[in-house]
A protein has these predicted regions:
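Extracytoplasmic low-complexity segments
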Residues: 2-129
Length: 131
């Protein structure tokens, strides 16, 4: 039995609430993932601003927006967009299809390593994981 999982994004549905400077964390991700589309840049910025505004940002270890359409863009953690295991970047293994709407494993051997260690990176009895 295999479990099919498709990881998609709906970031293009977000709308910016107005002008202003781009948040430094959003800009770091935009730069690392080479996001050039202004709508996606605005949506990423708004996502970061909103997560911070609702005091959710500091509670998260990793966020993977799956924007940019390639494995090279999809691998970056919005919280720490460095290309290192310690920054919880994704390493895709097996077969994957990457597109502007997200990433889909092949259903046979596709998986991604987050490098998040449950015993050291996550708090006991205070953890939530979403896919």
């Amino acid at each position: 039995m295999s479990l099919g999982i498709s990881i998609s994004n709906s970031i293009k549905g977000f709308r910016s609430s107005g002008g202003g400077a781009v948040d430094a964390d959003a800009q770091a991700f935009i730069t690392a993932a080479s996001i050039t589309d202004p709508t996606q840049q605005s949506a990423i910025n708004q996502l970061v601003v909103d997560l911070k505004g609702y005091s959710i940002w500091s509670k998260m270890k990793a966020i993977y927006p799956f924007v940019g359409g390639t494995a090279s863009a999809h691998k970056f953690n919005l919280k720490d967009p460095q290309d290192t295991d310690a920054a919880f970047r994704l390493v895709f293994n097996g077969g994957w299809t990457h597109s502007s709407t997200g990433a889909t494993p092949n259903g046979t051997n596709g998986w991604a390593d987050t490098f998040v260690k449950t015993g050291t990176d996550l708090a006991l009895n205070s953890t939530h994981v979403s896919v």
